[in-house]
Amino acid sequence: MEDSSEIKVETASSRTSWIQSSVAAGGKRISRALGYITGEMKECAEGLKDKSPVFQFLDWVLRGTSQVMFVNNPLSGILIVIGLFVQNPWWAIAGCLGTVMSTLTALILSQDRSAIASGLHGYNGVLVGLLIAVFSDKGDYYWWLLLPVIVMSMSCPILSSALGTIFSKWDLPVFTLPFNIAVTLYLAATGHYNLFFPTTLLQPVSSVPNITWSEIQVPLLLRAIPVGIGQVYGCDNPWTGGIFLIALFISSPLICLHAAIGSTMGMLAALTIATPFDSIYFGLCGFNSTLACIAVGGMFYVITWQTHLLAVACALFAAYVGAALTNVLSVFGLPTCTWPFCISALIFLLLTTNNPAIYKLPLSKVTYPEANRTYYLTQERNRRSSTITKYQAYDVS
């Protein structure tokens, strides 16, 4: 009887260990599978190196499409393109053409191949194509509009290279400055009364807006969060914004989180200065804050609770800068584009502090927030171990 009970105990324990090992193995397989589609999808890029150049170019274009939101992931790029078609197929066509021409121009100019492969010469092009279509007063499918889309998107790698030469002295990214310069020049050169390429008429506010606080609609305020994220690409469809959030979450949950926080901060900041409700509902107060919050919240700074608060502050700052520039540029009939984001993010990245928890990453080491933190923690462990070894050697001597 004792032997049989011992056998039963051994059988139960072996079965438990087998279940535990199976669960652990299954968890590793799931983690490995998720690793293929999350983050930067390095395995995809490596696997395409010996494939047709067409597939490689498509990968670069998709990464460029998602790099607008600091995401280097072709799957996210596919979802973003789908979101653009949900918003407006004509805008999507113009945006895709802008990315293709911008990436192709970078190849012709022999720009850094790794930067091209990461989509860093495509994201300004997609924004140029989209915003030229968005601000066109000719309506959809005005095919002649593709001419300025091609020309202005081809100027983006030139502007990126020139600005990169200057900004590299401070180890700063160029962000969307090439897009801002290209689109602002185009809109200033054409205008509403242009014969070939008329643009939407933008005018400054000439009267006090009629704001009744009791009429504010909370559901529309909540909807403004995904809409504000969609407005990064000039889209006001909440479904498109939701698709963009999914695209961000696939690559980096931290980017997704800070995008939502940034859009929310932009909305709240707009309420504090009595911005007309329609502008808030359409997400026009949230997109610059979205980008600013992502940039500081783990992208170029290692994510800590201190940099998280700094990201929130940067989002609020970008919202107020955006309100100021909207009033100034509307006098000239120009939109703010993402000038407020660029100004705010660059100011916060030039911040100097003795707080070790606010650590700005070298530009060459920036990937995505989760990997950035892993890199930082590894560097810290290596530094501490080398310091301990040095002190031990000193004690021995």
Curated annotation (Swiss-Prot):
Glycosylation positions in this chain: N210
InterPro entries: Ammonium/urea_transptr, Urea_transporter
Protein topology in the membrane: Multi-pass membrane protein
The reaction(s) this protein catalyses: urea(in) = urea(out)
Superkingdom, taxonomy of origin: Eukaryota
TM region(s), chain numbering: 68-85, 92-109, 115-135, 143-163, 172-192, 239-257, 264-280, 287-303, 309-329, 331-351
Entry comment describing in which tissues the protein is expressed: Kidney.
Localization in the cell: Apical cell membrane; Basolateral cell membrane
Inhibition and activation profile: Inhibited by urea analogs and phloretin.
Pfam family, one: UT
Keywords: Cell membrane, Glycoprotein, Membrane, Transmembrane, Transmembrane helix, Transport
GO molecular function, one term: urea transmembrane transporter activity
GO CC, any one term: basolateral plasma membrane
Job of this protein: Mediates the transport of urea driven by a concentration gradient across the cell membrane of the renal inner medullary collecting duct which is critical to the urinary concentrating mechanism.
Sequence similarity: Belongs to the urea transporter family.
Protein name as annotated: Urea transporter 2
Organism: Oryctolagus cuniculus (Rabbit)
Gene name for this UniProt entry: SLC14A2
